[in-house]
C-alpha cells in the first residue's frame, strides 16, 4: 500500500489553483476532443473523459479536504442517470476514493496519536496495528487493543487536514467550482443555488473535522440504540480520544465487498436494517446520520449491522422534524393538499414558487415510488436511476426542482436518498418498503420480523 508523508496543501490560493487550472484545461480539452470526433476520430470524447477522470480523481485523492469528501459523495450517485451521462467516467473513478485514499506513513500516524493524547502509544494501547484498516477523506483507522482487553478502532486525522478544510470552506468558490465542473461534465442544464448548497454541505463537513463533536454524536446514537436487537453503535473511549484522535469500541462484521457475496435473504435483512436506522433515527429522536456509504457499515452474519461513522450528523429542530415526517405521511396517504401545506411551512416555496398541490404531489409521489408501488420492491439500477432523475436531473425546464427552494435543513435528505438507493440496488434487496414506513410512523403494526423485534425492544 502506497503511503503519503507529504503535508496537506494549505491556504486558499494554494488549494484553489490546482482545481481551477485543471477545470480550465479540461474545458479546452473537451472542445478539442469534440472536434476530433466530428472529423472521424470515433470515441475521442469518451477517451478524453476517461483520461480526465483519472487525473481528477488523483487530484482529489491528495487534497485531504472538502473536495475529496464531495468526490466521495458523488461516487455513490448513478451518474449515467444524470443529464447525458457524461459524468459517468468520473463517477467510476471517484468510487476509488471510498477505500483507496493514500494513507499516512506509520511514523507520522504514531506521531499524531502521541502528540494529541500526550502519552506514548504503548501507555494507551496494549496492542496497536501500524497498518491502517481503512483510509478516508480526512483520516484513517487503525485497530488496537486497550489494556483491559477491549478491541477498539482508532481514527487518526491527517496532519493539516482540519486547517485545509477550513481554508476550503473560507474560499466559497472552491466547492462551487467543483459542482460546476460536475454539472458541465454531466451535460445537464441545471443551475442550482450553489451558494445554498455549499453553505449547508460546508456546515456538515466543518463538523467532520471536529473529532470531539463526532464523539458526542456517537454517544448520542449509542445511547439511543443501546441494547437494540439489530442496530449496533460503538462506544467512545474518552481517555483515548482527543482533538485529532477518536477511539471507539471495535464493531466486527463483514466489509462491503464481502457482504455483497452473502445469501440474498441476508442481504435483504441488512438493507432493511440500514433503512430502519436511516429513517428511524429522526423518528425516534431528532438525529439524522447524513453519510450513508458502504464503508460505514459492518455486516453481521446474524443480520445485524454496525454503524461506525458519525462525523456527518444533522440535528433537526423539533418543528422541522415533525413537519418533515408529516410531509412524508401526507405523500404516502395521498393527501396532496396537506403535503403542499407542509412543504410551504418547511420553506420549499420561499422563493414564490407556483408549484400547485397536484404538481407537488406528483413529484413527491414519484420520489416515494418504492413505498407506493405494489409490494415488495426489489431495488435495481433502475430504482437508483429513478431517484436521481426525480431529485437532480434537470433537463426538463418544467422539472419541479427548478420551481422550489430546498430549505437548508432538507439538503442532506437529498444526499440520503441518492446514496441509499444505490446501496440497496447493489445488495439487490427486496423489501416491504410501505409496511416499514407505516411501522416506523406508528400508522400500522409491524409485519416484518425486524419490525417485530424493534417493537418488542421499544
In which residue ranges do the predicted regions lie?
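Broad phosphate/nucleotide-binding scaffolds in NTP-utilizing and phosphate-metabolizing enzymes
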Residues: 1-279, 286, 300-304, 310-318, ...
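Short amphipathic alpha-helical recognition elements used for nucleic-acid or partner binding
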Residues: 324-326
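Short helix-adjacent coil turns
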Residues: 334-335
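Catalytic-loop of the protein kinase fold
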Residues: 284-294
Amino acid at each position: 500500500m502506497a503511503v503519503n508523508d507529504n503535508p496537506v496543501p494549505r491556504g486558499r490560493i494554494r488549494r484553489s489553483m490546482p482545481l481551477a487550472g485543471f477545470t480550465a484545461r479540461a474545458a479546452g480539452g473537451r472542445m478539442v476532443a469534440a472536434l476530433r470526433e466530428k472529423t472521424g476520430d470515433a470515441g475521442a470524447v469518451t477517451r478524453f473523459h476517461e483520461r480526465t477522470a483519472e487525473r481528477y480523481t488523483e487530484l482529489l485523492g491528495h487534497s485531504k479536504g472538502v473536495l475529496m469528501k464531495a468526490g466521495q459523495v458523488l461516487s455513490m450517485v448513478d451518474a449515467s442517470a444524470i443529464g447525458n451521462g457524461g459524468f459517468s467516467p468520473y463517477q467510476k473513478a471517484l468510487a476509488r476514493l471510498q477505500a483507496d485514499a493514500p494513507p499516512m506513513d506509520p511514523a507520522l500516524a504514531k506521531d499524531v496519536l502521541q502528540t494529541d493524547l500526550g502519552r506514548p502509544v504503548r501507555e494507551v494501547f496494549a496492542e496497536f496495528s501500524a497498518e491502517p484498516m481503512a483510509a478516508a477523506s480526512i483520516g484513517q483507522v487503525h485497530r488496537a487493543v486497550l489494556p483491559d482487553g477491549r478491541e477498539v478502532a482508532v481514527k487518526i486525522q491527517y496532519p493539516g487536514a482540519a486547517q485545509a478544510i477550513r481554508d476550503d470552506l473560507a474560499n466559497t468558490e472552491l466547492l462551487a467550482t467543483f459542482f460546476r465542473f460536475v454539472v458541465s461534465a454531466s451535460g445537464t442544464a441545471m443551475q442550482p443555488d450553489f451558494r445554498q448548497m455549499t453553505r449547508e454541505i460546508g456546515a456538515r463537513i466543518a463538523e467532520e473535522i471536529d473529532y470531539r463533536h463526532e464523539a458526542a454524536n456517537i454517544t448520542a446514537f449509542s445511547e439511543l440504540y443501546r441494547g437494540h436487537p439489530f442496530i449496533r453503535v460503538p462506544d467512545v473511549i474518552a481517555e483515548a480520544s482527543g482533538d485529532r484522535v477518536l477511539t471507539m469500541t471495535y464493531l466486527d462484521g463483514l466489509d462491503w465487498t464481502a457482504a455483497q457475496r452473502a445469501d440474498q435473504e441476508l442481504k435483504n435483512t441488512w438493507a432493511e436494517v440500514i433503512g430502519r436506522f436511516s429513517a428511524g433515527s429522526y423518528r425516534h429522536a431528532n438525529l439524522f446520520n447524513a453519510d450513508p456509504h458502504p464503508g460505514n457499515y459492518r455486516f453481521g452474519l446474524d443480520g445485524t449491522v454496525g454503524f461506525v461513522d458519525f462525523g456527518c450528523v444533522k440535528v433537526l429542530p423539533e418543528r422541522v422534524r415533525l413537519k418533515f415526517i408529516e410531509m412524508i405521511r401526507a405523500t404516502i396517504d395521498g393527501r396532496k393538499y396537506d403535503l403542499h401545506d407542509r412543504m410551504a411551512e418547511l420553506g420549499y416555496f420561499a422563493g414564490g414558487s407556483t408549484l400547485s398541490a397536484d404538481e407537488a404531489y406528483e413529484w413527491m409521489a414519484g420520489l416515494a415510488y418504492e413505498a407506493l408501488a405494489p409490494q415488495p420492491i426489489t431495488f435495481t439500477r433502475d430504482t437508483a436511476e429513478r431517484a436521481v432523475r426525480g431529485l437532480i436531473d434537470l433537463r426538463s425546464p418544467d422539472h419541479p426542482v427548478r420551481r422550489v427552494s430546498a430549505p437548508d435543513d432538507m439538503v442532506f435528505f437529498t444526499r440520503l436518498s441518492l446514496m441509499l438507493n444505490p446501496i440497496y440496488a447493489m445488495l439487490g434487496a427486496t423489501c416491504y418498503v410501505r409496511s416499514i414506513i407505516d411501522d416506523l410512523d406508528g400508522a400500522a403494526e409491524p409485519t416484518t420480523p425486524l419490525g417485530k423485534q424493534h417493537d418488542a425492544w421499544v
